[in-house]
A protein has these predicted regions:
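Metallo-beta-lactamase
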Residues: 25, 91-92, 115, 121-214
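Residue-level detector of beta-strand structural context in well-folded domains
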Residues: 5, 15-17, 108, 113-114, ...
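Short Gly/Pro-enriched turn/cap motifs at secondary-structure boundaries
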Residues: 7-8, 106-107, 127-129
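Conserved S/T- and glycine-rich ATP-binding loop of Class I adenylate-forming
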Residues: 19, 54, 128
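Small/polar loops that bind or transfer phosphate-bearing groups
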Residues: 28-30, 53, 77, 120, ...
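Conserved beta-strand hairpin/beta-sheet module of binuclear metal-dependent hydrolase folds
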Residues: 2-44, 137-146
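Active-site HxH/HxHxD metal-binding segment of metal-dependent hydrolases
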Residues: 33-116, 200-210
């Protein structure tokens, strides 16, 4: 049974997750405060094997280079998010008005249907674009990490370059909402929820939602 640890990091309060199984672990969305993340990993005596970004907006990847250097593990993304990663500095300057370091280099790519083994835990990669072209969700036994696709009573924004509302709604309804209702959702920001709760009451994509796919 996996343990999922949450570390809230950075100015946008990103949820960085440490998914641990039998001391092996993957680090998901190390968006800032890398030394704190590594210290936590070492404190729980986990042995990380990958860094994974659910997508490559700056608040999910700023800590990657330092975490990778300290732990000597590869960084994985979906290939369709590579252009967004490579233009991270100019996009942050344009939309946020401040400077960030150069983007991290990518060591490998994930695609829909891939599986990541973390000891005896199998994590399934779901391509869930809409918030960004290469957004992925990571689904395991009774849980899914959704990045900025699906939140507690909300969905990811789609007004940034590469975002598309209809695509996001389709990803949520046709991929995430196919999971069991009691699946725990670990989003990129904010508190946990469940698939069942969001299917019922999410104001954007739930049963009474006002948004429809065109």
């Amino acid at each position: 049974m996996a343990k999922i640890h949450t570390i809230v990091v950075g100015r946008l309060q990103t949820n960085c997750y440490i998914l641990e199984s039998n001391t092996a672990a993957i680090i998901i969305d190390p968006g800032d405060e890398p030394e704190r993340i590594v210290r936590f990993v070492r404190d729980i005596k986990a042995k990380p094997i990958h860094i994974v970004a659910t997508h490559t907006h700056f608040d999910h990847v700023l800590g990657v280079d330092t975490v990778r250097a300290m732990l000597n593990i590869p960084f994985l993304i979906h290939r369709e998010d590579l252009p967004m990663l490579e233009s991270m500095q100019s996009r942050v300057r344009q939309f946020m008005g401040f400077e960030v370091p150069p983007p991290p280099k990518v060591d490998g790519y994930l695609k829909d249907g891939d599986s990541l083994k973390v000891a005896d835990e199998t994590i399934h990669v779901l391509h869930t674009p809409g918030h960004s072209p290469g957004s992925v969700s990571l689904a395991g036994d009774g849980y899914v990490l959704t990045g900025d696709a699906l939140f507690n009573q909300s969905i990811g924004r789609t007004d940034l370059p590469g975002g598309d509302l209809n695509t996001l709604i389709h990803s949520i309804r046709e991929r995430l909402f196919k999971l069991d209702d009691d699946t725990t959702v670990y989003p990129g920001h904010g508190p946990e929820t469940t698939i069942g709760d969001e299917k019922l009451a999410n104001p954007f994509v739930g049963k009474a939602a006002r948004l429809q796919i065109r």
